[in-house]
């Protein structure tokens, strides 16, 4: 190395290790990258938080909008009912009879449906079709993963491939479309219960045999005739290429069952207003009440029809008889459940609830409504159960209620019945434009109109002919024509049709049922008054009041009789009074005793059930054996002895009091106040004109069975004849 090189001390440092500033550069670069990454993460986190906040805000806005639409939809129906009520008042004031309130409610529903369909904007871009070829069936609940978030969807029904692009996009129309279960669980129970609770038992039981024949046999005949005719129509539609999906024979029978449910509410309202013949009213009302129950059980039995083998829609004898057994089981089970749950009279009998009318009315309401839900929960039919619950409540529980609760319960269910029925008919008009799955088939609709006409004719005329063979008071041709004309369809047929609209066949049935209801309510209902005049059916028939009946002269009449049969001479000692009034020519004739099973039931009800369940009837200490004395004293209420004021049920029950009736069992005579004496087995009615009530009404109210009057064997009712002087 040269000497000059040693004189440069910095040259060795430059060529050896790097300078310290260069060493800091990677550190500064790493630190900068970390700061940049942190800043980027912070900004992305803030963006995510902002996005989440925006999603929550959008969700809250959707919930608020949904709540607003719910309020608007309910307000729409309330305004419909309000407008209907005001128009009804105007019609009644002007005595307009060509249009009933139910038809009016349907018209208003149609108008609102048109406004909602064509006057409210649709919301687009919120529906999307997704394909899932890995599954071979639909699920009731579906969880969908959208960007890591799971959303729950529920099944609403099947949509045909041709209508995928026409799915309803209007949220408002979706809001006014109710779940069908709302009709069954909320709206139908008060309608059916009111029919049973307000039943006029006098005329109903006087025509009970005919009513049962029309309701059971007639509905079955109508169902099978309509079903077979519609099956022919379906075959014709297949030949003509007018049927785009499956439509089986069981579907036709199901349609026959639901469309056989009559609802002559318009006709009955006009009958009641014009005071038409009471027997005709009883036949139509009784048939419609029981007919609804039969139709719903019959439809359930048809749905349960499952033949063995691959072809599940072919006829199979074993499956047929199994369906018949299901029909009998469901109907009898529902009847039993309704009657048993309706016998809650002991709750009102052995408690002091009558001191608190509000609690008494509330308990009565809840126990009555729970009958429907209990029957449905147990696999029976709530319609049948709540119907017979209403009849049982009216026969037993009503007598135990306080005066205020009686008025409250009748008015409560009357108001609920009115509102529910008009709500359903308003919804019918609305559904013509808001329902999303209508299937209009002209051939099917025309065939259905022809089928229900022929089914009604085969229902009324042949049965009336056979019934007249055993009836003393024949069902005249004018009555038969009026019953044929009065086969309106209404709330029950609509509720059964809308309950299942998942398949193509059921959607076609629903649309056709809706049009049939419109036609029968508007056209047939509007023609009721002219038809009454054309058929020369009596109107303005006023039932004799109790005071008028008390003026009649009384004479002996046989107990436990069938008013429809001719009387052979008989020396039986069962007798009650028959009035010598305007119908004395008919009433004075002796009549043959009814079947022994009815006599046993009447006697059992009067002597045991009424005293056990109500404050009515003879004390159990006089009807039960001596060894049951303790039980009899426990079940007999003090009101049986010391009740000074008669508790009356309108047109059904009568609770005996002192001065009205003295009951004799064996050698012991027991008056209503509990006093007794020993004499022969007789029963005497006492009191002056001030305290005397119609003897026919007494027994009729006590038994709740109308003109079929019964007394237990070995007991006579002795009534003093009034002096003609």
From Swiss-Prot:
Main location: Golgi
Region span, Required for trans-Golgi network localization: 533-559, 563-568
Free-text activity regulation comment from the record: Inhibited by benzamil and quinine but not by amiloride.
Post-translational modification: N-glycosylated.
Listed Low complexity bias regions: 675-684
InterPro entries: Cation/H_exchanger_CPA1, Cation/H_exchanger_TM, NaH_exchanger, NHE-6/7/9
Bias-annotated ranges (Basic and acidic residues): 687-704
Chain ranges passing through the membrane: 22-42, 71-91, 96-116, 176-196, 211-231, 252-272, 278-298, 323-343, 350-370, 371-391, 415-435, 443-463, 475-497, 514-534
Topology of this chain in the membrane: Multi-pass membrane protein
Cytoplasmic-facing ranges: 1-21, 92-95, 197-210, 273-277, 344-349, 392-414, 464-474, 535-725
Tissue specificity comment: Ubiquitously expressed.
Subcellular localization(s) per the UniProt record: Golgi apparatus, trans-Golgi network membrane; Recycling endosome membrane; Cell membrane
Record's keyword terms, sorted: Antiport, Cell membrane, Disease variant, Endosome, Glycoprotein, Golgi apparatus, Intellectual disability, Ion transport, Membrane, Phosphoprotein, Potassium, Potassium transport, Sodium, Sodium transport, Transmembrane, Transmembrane helix, Transport
Role this protein plays: Golgi Na(+), K(+)/(H+) antiporter. Mediates the electoneutral influx of Na(+) or K(+) in exchange for H(+). May contribute to the regulation of Golgi apparatus volume and pH.
Protein name: Sodium/hydrogen exchanger 7
Species the sequence originates in: Homo sapiens (Human)
